[in-house]
Amino acid sequence: MSRIGKRIIEIPSSVQASVEGSKLLFKNGKEKHELETHNRVKITLENNQLSFQPVGEDAQSRAYWGTYGALANNIVIGLSTGFSKILEVNGVGYKVALGNKTLDLSLGFSHPVKYPIPAGIEMVVEKNTITIKGSDKQKVGQVAAEIRSFRPPEPYKGKGVKYSDEVIIRKAGKTAKK
């Protein structure tokens, strides 16, 4: 029995939800999300409460049950409060600036890295900290991972782009021979 799937999702008043066949539609004042579900999952929406039930008793139906419960919950949380990731840029001469629909990064390369900000994502830059905000959890995480991949933190001095809660395991450098 799926612990995630059997949980009932409370839909706040700021989010409107509707079911059209196997599609779930969510929207708040400015954004809209759609979730296409599999036919092995039954959707029930009553009194601003969303629940899922597996159609069969096989393992595949139970797997879809939990998956779609988690995806719908993430959409509701994203539309009501939103998701955010914080990245820190560490290193001498490493700089971050917010341009016109681009994020400009100076990460020690011979050229500046320009990252186009995708639709639905908002970025705030303070000193060497990048805050990525959005309503789509997958998109926020993907953008953060792409920015981090330009210069991941290295284990000797810790220079690079890292998540704010990431712990870098440091290595000792070479020792001199006597």
Curated annotation (Swiss-Prot):
Renumbered to this chain, the signal peptide range is: none
The record's keywords, sorted A to Z, are: Ribonucleoprotein, Ribosomal protein, RNA-binding, rRNA-binding
Q: Write down the InterPro entries for this protein, in alphabetical order.
A: Ribosomal_uL6-like, Ribosomal_uL6-like_a/b-dom_sf, Ribosomal_uL6_a/b-dom, Ribosomal_uL6_bac-type, Ribosomal_uL6_CS
Name a GO molecular-function annotation.
rRNA binding
Assembly mode: Part of the 50S ribosomal subunit.
Record GO cellular component, one term: cytosolic large ribosomal subunit
What job does this protein perform?
A: This protein binds to the 23S rRNA, and is important in its secondary structure. It is located near the subunit interface in the base of the L7/L12 stalk, and near the tRNA binding site of the peptidyltransferase center.
Q: Which organism was this protein described from?
A: Helicobacter pylori (strain HPAG1)
The record's similarity note reads: Belongs to the universal ribosomal protein uL6 family.
GO BP annotations of the record are: cytoplasmic translation
Matching entries from NCBIfam families are given as: L6_bact (TIGR03654)
Protein name, UniProt field: Large ribosomal subunit protein uL6
Source organism superkingdom: Bacteria
PANTHER family in alphabetical order:
60S/50S RIBOSOMAL PROTEIN L6/L9, LARGE RIBOSOMAL SUBUNIT PROTEIN UL6M
